[in-house]
Amino acid sequence: MKAAFFNGSGQMVVSDHPDPVPGDYDAIIKVRATGICGSDLLMNNDKTEADELPAGHEVGGEIVEVGKKVNKTLIGQRVAIETIGQGRACESCWFCRSGQYRQCTNMAAPEGGGFAQYIKRKAIGCYQIDKNTSWAQSALVEPLAVSIHGARRGELKGGDKVVILGAGTIGLTAVVAAKQLGAGKVIITARHDQQAKMALNLGADIALNSDSPNTGEEILELTDGRGADLTIETVGGKNPATLVQAVEFTRMQGRISILGGFRTPLTFDWLKPLLKEQSIHFSSCYGVIDGK
């Protein structure tokens, strides 16, 4: 099959790669859509050697083959794929039995991701989508799950005033997650006009310019002078700017949920969140939702 690889020089190249072969509990999925995550771009920029396996973890496709112990009726199903969690989890360690497959201590070896014509994952990590869901939408299921998990890690409560830092894919899906989980007001910071418009279309109440020096003052005005009950950080990167903003924009005894991937060690003033008695939660990928 054809697959795309980061070549270690900041470029992606297409070349031949062996077709995946299913194990007993696996499914082979013909890839129909793969999203490009910000983490893919950050890792590509950091690489100095070519990848041996294709990346890509926001994937939707059609099951075309299954292993010996998988129900054959799954063939032909349209699915979104949990590439990192159940798709590779052992299902027997303490974390798997607790429903936290992303934290599996016996994770199967990487098999390659969705920047390829086909991908192999455990069948239990494939979630059926209906015929009215487009392939592009199927690739958004994974980042939406990331945002739902992050909002839950931040203990979002009904009526909360929520600030979302960043309006990329994770920030935009965090708008949907926060609204569906009962947020009373959702304020998002966006760098580009088209991001702000999309955030408002998805349900954000207010979109602010992330580069404005007045953003902090505006957030205070919009939150009755207190600050956000919960701030969801979705940017990450190589400097602590959005971490500093998260502390600034969040009220005393408020909560911060960090979804963004920070790629280098950072210097950060921990005294400020300590004095404000803020709770800081880190969130990686996704877990079960209400036991499902």
How would you name each of these model-derived features?
Residues 133-213, 217:
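Mid-domain Rossmann-like dinucleotide-binding core that forms the NAD(H)/NADP(H) cofactor-binding site
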Residues 20-34, 47-92, 130-132:
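Glycine-rich beta-strand-centered segment in the early N-terminal region that forms part
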Residues 85-165:
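NAD(P)H dinucleotide-binding glycine-rich loop of Rossmann-like/cofactor-binding domains
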